[in-house]
A protein has these predicted regions:
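Low-complexity intrinsically disordered segments
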Residues: 35-138
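Short, extreme N-terminal segment that most often corresponds to the first beta-strand
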Residues: 1-26
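Extracellular/luminal recognition modules and glycoprotein regions
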Residues: 3, 25-34, 77-78
Length: 138
């Protein structure tokens, strides 16, 4: 069974851009990877440019010249539907505010968890309806 999630970035204008992630969306999976490996807005923007992803890895790009395919994935590399499986390209969904993201992204993405990179910190939308900071080892 997949644990789906949405990964979002709050931009300076208050909008939230978000993508879908199909696997390991729980805080100990995607949450831990985001907190450890995606620590600045530039890297999060690069992740969002991939569009929808099957799985999140510590690395965004596969090694040059090495195969990275659905049944032969490089270890710790993000697997993107368009780039790696040649599915139609998808772009990030943009919400006008964090409130809109909180209220709509779960149903839009069929997501169990929502993540948000806001002002240098990763947050997860908790089951109590609040954003909670993800604490990870550095």
């Amino acid at each position: 069974m997949s644990t789906r999630c949405a990964i979002g970035l709050k931009r300076e204008n208050g909008e939230v851009a978000a993508i879908y992630c199909h696997n390991d969306g729980y805080p100990e999976g995607v949450g831990a990877i985001l907190g450890r490996w995606y620590r600045n807005a530039e890297k999060v923007e690069a992740l969002l440019k991939l569009g929808s992803i099957s799985s999140l890895g510590a690395k965004l790009e596969p090694e040059a010249g090495a195969e990275h395919a659905f049944f032969n994935r490089q270890q710790d590399v993000t697997y993107a539907y368009h780039r790696d499986r040649k599915d139609p390209e998808t772009s990030a969904t943009v919400y006008p505010s964090v409130k809109s993201y909180s209220e709509n992204a779960r149903k839009d993405f069929w997501a169990d968890f929502l993540y948000l990179f806001d002002n240098g910190k990763w947050l997860v939308f908790g089951s109590n309806g609040d954003w909670v900071e993800i604490k990870t080892e550095k």
